[in-house]
């Protein structure tokens, strides 16, 4: 399955909520009707969505938020299920610990897609070592930094400025002047927030 490269707003409308695929700081709510499906008049249906359909939609939504494809998502779920504790929370913590997501959370990219591109283009280091795998799992204490050659990129400077205005998550510590941040700890479920019902995904894979 190829990665979706079409209009990002369409995905948010399909899920009925802003997935922040365009920007973490600018909501789509004022630009398009998130409560109507894609299409000129929005798709309507009188049929009630089945439990399976609801669970599937939730999985699709989370996959789109984090930019993860099906096979990789299944691997994340399998790992989350093997770990102790709540499987749904484990899943979200694994996704939040991805390098591209941490780069995004630190404000170096305005979207996860942009953060993923920074990693793929070798603009990021982890503990001083160049990293180019977006799915790399970041561990507590790891230091993420922008490479010297990329520090003058306007998109990084703008994204970081907007992130500073909006506030950073409590589980990262960012030094904007040095273009680096520390992954303090794996976030707790309450720290992740978002319009996500991970229990629906657990129910889906438990069928």
From Swiss-Prot:
A GO MF label: rRNA binding
Biased composition (Polar residues): 42-53
Keywords from the UniProt entry: Ribonucleoprotein, Ribosomal protein, RNA-binding, rRNA-binding
Chain segments annotated as transmembrane: none
CDD domains: S4 (cd00165)
A GO CC term assigned to this protein in UniProt: small ribosomal subunit
Region span, Disordered: 31-55
Domain S4 RNA-binding per the UniProt entry, residue ranges: 97-160
GO biological process: one example: translation
Keyword flag Nucleotidyltransferase: no
Database matches in HAMAP family: Ribosomal_uS4_B (MF_01306_B)
Role according to the record: One of the primary rRNA binding proteins, it binds directly to 16S rRNA where it nucleates assembly of the body of the 30S subunit. With S5 and S12 plays an important role in translational accuracy.
Subunit structure: Part of the 30S ribosomal subunit. Contacts protein S5. The interaction surface between S4 and S5 is involved in control of translational fidelity.
NCBIfam families according to UniProt: PRK05327.1, rpsD_bact
PANTHER family documented for this protein: 30S 40S RIBOSOMAL PROTEIN (PTHR11831), SMALL RIBOSOMAL SUBUNIT PROTEIN US4M (PTHR11831:SF4)
Recorded family membership: Belongs to the universal ribosomal protein uS4 family.
Protein name: Small ribosomal subunit protein uS4
Species of provenance: Burkholderia multivorans (strain ATCC 17616 / 249)
Recorded name of the encoding gene: rpsD
